[in-house]
Amino acid sequence: MFALSVSSEAGITRRLEKLTNNPEKCRGCGRRFSTGMTSTGEMARQLNDTCAGSVDMELFLHYSLIPSLCIILVLSFLQRRERCRQRDDTSYLLGDHFGIIVPLDFVGAFSNRWSYGIAFGATANKVMFLFLEGYQPLQVPQWAQAFVLLVGGFEVGLSHFPFFACLSSEFRLVSSILGFSYSLIWFVVTVLHITQCPHGRFLGRFETVMFYWPSLLCLSFLLGRFLHMAVKSLRVHLGWALQMKEKPFLEIHQAEHVKQLLRKPPLQEEQKSWFQTRVYEWDPCFQFPSRMIGTVVLAFICLYLFIVIEFCMFVYVREKLDVFEGKLESYIASVNQTGPLAPVILQVKELMNISKGVWLVTILPAALTCVSYLFHILACYRKHMKRLWAGNKHFLPVKFHSPSSSGSVVAIARYSGWQIAYILWGYFIIHVVQSLLGMVITYGLVLPVIHDQGLEMLHGLGIGILTVSIVLGLMIVQVQIASSFFLQPRMAAADKQKPLALNNRRAFHNFNYFLFFYNVLLGLGACLSRLLISCILGTWLIARIDRTIMQRGYERADMGFGAWVGMLYVDHCHTNPVLVSFCHILIAGHRERTLRPVIKYGHLNQSAGVTSRTANLEGCSCQDPGQSH
């Protein structure tokens, strides 16, 4: 699900070089740019022209499988199998060793949430290039690309498996040492790769640093985390500290939630602040699972990397447009600005300049929109889970009230990866829509003022606003006439509206007849507005996987929303605080009933042993050896 990939900068370089037929310089090669770029672009490329790093991140990814498999084998050997097979099975020779290692509990894990999230964040730049299909370890036909990406995902997933396995292992001392060593290897290799070639061909100075600093930060956190685990485990091993408690079946926040349900609701609710009412209210009786924390952390870092990659593409395209613009200026100068194509060329130059400016300006609002979506998705997850805990399913479409069990299990495996992909594609689509909107505003409002056509623009804008106002006013007048003349009075003074009972029927029929022809024309505008609003809302909410953008009755066609609902049902069935508390009571009662006879019979056996030993001692002391027969 959380797949990984290879070197960020190298992947961008390879993909961008496919966009042009001109010979360009690769990292560590002797080819140069032959196109005439701006001085800034040439300086940026010259920074990395002679860089030939000794670290090949793709090759290191392949070789990292060796220590990864060794760590997995060690942890698997330490992991005990709960159920051993029969003697006629060959696995019996292994004893109870080599159990299955679980990297992360994707359903009910609430501890080490941020450690798992940071571990996923350390793989963000790798995830990005599987998302962009920048990593293909094998060259196969086009129809087999899906299998190649699957193999690549398994390979890079296996290379980062020790991060999660060492965090979740029960053998804290061994796993912390192995995890620290493996994280240190990745950290040193990444730092070596950055220091050898810190600059790049697209962003110039410190381009490689911009790609790798999130992974370095996450690896640094993991180093500190594994070191802290090793120190704590060593103190316990030496007897300097108490043994850590076993992971509880019932989490504290789940128990607090059940206690809150059993309490009487307060007579008067506490007054909430503006932040709690409008933004977010913290709930001590609810915790997000590790899967949600890891998804959000990875989505944040992937969104940042996606924006950086997009900016690299923008720099590349902008330099190509600058070259094209220079050729257009040369043509205009050659014809002394009197040629038949001169006005068209000036308009094309203006279009290119406006497009570059609008695209650059809309990066920030598009990014902020997607960031707000990530926070909103967390809030919706908590809200939807609480509704399901209360037995309320009315917020879901009717077709999703009873999803299939197999579909829900698959959904929880799909959700995290799909959420990240939806955020990235949503950012790009929102950015395109905002850029088009910016182009419309620029051509409709800004350029007329620049070209001394402000009065004509205001005249046309005023006529348009007046036309729309009249149309909306006539629609409001129709509603007011219907309320005043064609409905019977309220039955009670406390009624909010009049009853749906017709009055003045003859006038009502004439009203409908004469407005019939007008409403045909009005319906054309309403239809176009419906299409426009649907397109805007659909593109604006494309990144929101927590709500469907399909019409009622077609919700099943939204696969992302189906994954969201299936994930909610799995979490609802496995982490419902009331259900978990009930199971906790059953398990505790069973343990108590199991231990009680053992304690009772053990006490009786101990008493019987003491009595018999006492009797034997008394018999030996009272009996005279000489009187024995």
Model regions: which residues?
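Solvent-exposed, extramembrane regions of membrane proteins
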Residues: F2-G523, L528-H629
